[in-house]
């Protein structure tokens, strides 16, 4: 199946007003403006965007708003690394969208370079929160580090140093795993584009959890709040269900909100298209189907939350800090589900239906070959 060449203008992309998404609380961190500034500083320092138009598109994307909506417990001294990670993620996503095949993107080489930037760091005492590391906020007039690695790898390495130095080894391992899956998913998306293949629903859910970058984004909830969920609870059936369902809600809603833009650029790895193909229905019926799925996922999430509360209540030896970490993480996942919708409904990244990308520069990945 190929995507339609014309984009229907009458598609209803938002859920009905009584949808379960709107029953989740809307949140907003007070740090939005500072986050918007930091995002542009990261992009400027590492020269990650293609000139004034792309820089303006980055500004108009309002990534700071997305972070502010989805990380309501974000601590002031942790803004810069979070802003840096989202800058990296959106730029690399746009870069890969410009390649017709994984080979053209040099995917294997790129993945190894990015993962090399994510080496384990000693899990010592976290730096004092009232004394962030020197140079915590990048400055526009700073020169990027000199070396053989490409700018996106250099930027990720700096972001990772600031993130990992505050986190446990277990958190670092989980984040690195999720980042590897995120990078792996680019190859499958490129294969789909190359062969104009809309994926089957049977494998799409797992692919989309990885390609959407939502799993490392949820890991960052713990960094942002300065509270880590105990490792055993992370592996509980209840919390795994909550993470999976929150991830699915975010990426499937994103598929709906980005549909018009993805039809224009020829993207085929989209849940709405997968549903349309599998069920043999039109795009609007597929969108409605997706939102019914999202409502069911939220219901499963909330029932798992109740079960997790019971588990924590009977788990002898849990500290108050552990319970607070679980509560904050749960609250953050709800903020992500709602905040992604509210941000995506107005961000020019999706509202502006065009082919402008933040960067088309292959040197950011370390290669000059283009499709």
Model-derived segments and spans:
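Alpha-helical, largely C-terminal catalytic domains
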Residues: 1-371
């Amino acid at each position: 199946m190929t995507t339609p060449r014309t984009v229907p203008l009458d598609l209803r992309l938002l859920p009905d007003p009584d949808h379960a998404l709107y029953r989740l609380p809307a949140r907003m961190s007070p740090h939005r403006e500072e986050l918007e500034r930091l995002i542009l500083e990261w992009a400027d320092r590492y020269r990650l965007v293609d000139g004034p138009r792309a820089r303006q598109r980055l500004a108009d994307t309002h990534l700071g708003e997305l972070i502010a909506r989805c990380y309501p417990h974000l601590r002031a001294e942790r803004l810069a690394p979070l802003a840096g990670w989202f800058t990296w993620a959106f730029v690399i996503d746009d870069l890969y969208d410009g390649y017709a095949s994984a080979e053209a993107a040099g995917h294997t080489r790129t993945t190894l370079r990015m993962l090399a930037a994510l080496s384990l760091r000693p899990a010592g005492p976290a730096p004092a929160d009232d004394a962030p590391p020197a140079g915590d906020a990048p400055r526009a007039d700073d020169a990027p580090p000199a070396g053989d690695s490409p700018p996106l790898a250099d930027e990720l390495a700096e972001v990772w140093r600031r993130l990992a130095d505050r986190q446990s080894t277990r958190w670092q391992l989980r984040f690195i795993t999720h980042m590897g899956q995120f990078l792996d998913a680019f190859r499958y998306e490129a294969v789909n584009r190359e062969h104009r293949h809309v994926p089957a629903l049977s494998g799409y859910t797992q692919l989309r959890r990885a390609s959407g970058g939502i799993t490392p984004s949820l890991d960052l909830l713990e960094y942002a709040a300065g509270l880590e969920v105990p490792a055993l609870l992370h592996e509980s059936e209840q919390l795994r269900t909550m993470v999976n369902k929150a991830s699915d809600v975010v990426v499937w809603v994103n598929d709906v909100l980005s549909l018009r833009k993805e039809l224009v650029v020829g993207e085929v790895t989209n849940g709405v298209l997968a549903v349309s193909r599998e069920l043999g229905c039109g795009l609007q019926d597929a969108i409605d189907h997706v939102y019914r799925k999202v409502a069911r996922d939220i219901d499963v999430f909330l029932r798992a939350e109740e079960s997790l509360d019971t588990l924590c209540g009977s788990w002898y030896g849990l500290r108050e800090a552990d319970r607070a970490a679980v509560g904050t993480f749960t609250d953050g996942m709800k903020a992500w589900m709602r905040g992604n919708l509210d941000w995506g409904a107005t961000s020019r990244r999706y509202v502006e239906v065009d082919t402008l990308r933040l960067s088309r520069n292959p040197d950011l990945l370390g290669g000059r070959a283009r499709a």
